[in-house]
Every structure is written in C-alpha cells, then in structure tokens.
Amino acid sequence: MRIDKFLQSVGLVKRRVLATDMCNVGAVWLNGSCAKASKEVKAGDTISLHYLKGIEEYTILQIPALKNVPRKDTHLYIAPKTKE
C-alpha cells in the first residue's frame, strides 16, 4: 500500500491529498529516510511525521484491507513508538 493511502486509511491525516503534500515537503519519513507519496509500506516499517509541534513516530503493525479503518480499530494497524 502507498504511504499516502496508508496515512489516510488509518486516520493519521484526514485526506490523501494532504498526505501527498506532506510527503512532497519532506514531512513524512519512512524507516529513517524521506518518503515520496508513492513509497510502498509494509508491516514492521517505522513512519515519522514531522509537525511544527514536534515529531510523531509510529510502527506499522499490519496493512488494512479496508479503505478506511474505524477510529476504534486504529490500534490494530499502528502503534506509537515510545520515547527512550
């Protein structure tokens, strides 16, 4: 699944266009490198979202089969990375 579609599907961003724009300006990182919107993601990958307020990191647990994941089921697909 493309990273922009994944971000929208699990609810980290509201619209896929916004996810694409974030990738274009370098605000989305995948496994430590800047990711283009078309980059494929898989279970076990780490996503970093660079916001003005700071960086949020998530680990992908599995790829959703549904177009949109209900908010109550988001924890099945991503897990926030803990700070050490």
UniProtKB/Swiss-Prot annotation:
<dbReference type="Pfam" id="PF01479">
    <property type="entry name" value="S4"/>
</dbReference>
<protein>
    <recommendedName>
        <fullName>RQC P-site tRNA stabilizing factor</fullName>
    </recommendedName>
</protein>
<dbReference type="InterPro" id="IPR002942">
    <property type="entry name" value="S4_RNA-bd"/>
</dbReference>
<dbReference type="InterPro" id="IPR036986">
    <property type="entry name" value="S4_RNA-bd_sf"/>
</dbReference>
<keyword id="KW-0820">tRNA-binding</keyword>
<dbReference type="GO" id="GO:0019843">
    <property type="term" value="F:rRNA binding"/>
</dbReference>
<dbReference type="GO" id="GO:0006412">
    <property type="term" value="P:translation"/>
</dbReference>
<keyword id="KW-0699">rRNA-binding</keyword>
<comment type="subunit">
    <text>Associates with stalled 50S ribosomal subunits. Binds to RqcH, 23S rRNA and the P-site tRNA. Does not require RqcH for association with 50S subunits.</text>
</comment>
<feature type="domain" description="S4 RNA-binding">
    <location>
        <begin position="1"/>
        <end position="64"/>
    </location>
</feature>
<dbReference type="InterPro" id="IPR025490">
    <property type="entry name" value="RqcP"/>
</dbReference>
<dbReference type="GO" id="GO:0000049">
    <property type="term" value="F:tRNA binding"/>
</dbReference>
<keyword id="KW-0648">Protein biosynthesis</keyword>
<keyword id="KW-0694">RNA-binding</keyword>
<comment type="similarity">
    <text>Belongs to the RqcP family.</text>
</comment>
<comment type="function">
    <text>Key component of the ribosome quality control system (RQC), a ribosome-associated complex that mediates the extraction of incompletely synthesized nascent chains from stalled ribosomes and their subsequent degradation. RqcH recruits Ala-charged tRNA, and with RqcP directs the elongation of stalled nascent chains on 50S ribosomal subunits, leading to non-templated C-terminal alanine extensions (Ala tail). The Ala tail promotes nascent chain degradation. RqcP is associated with the translocation-like movement of the peptidyl-tRNA from the A-site into the P-site.</text>
</comment>
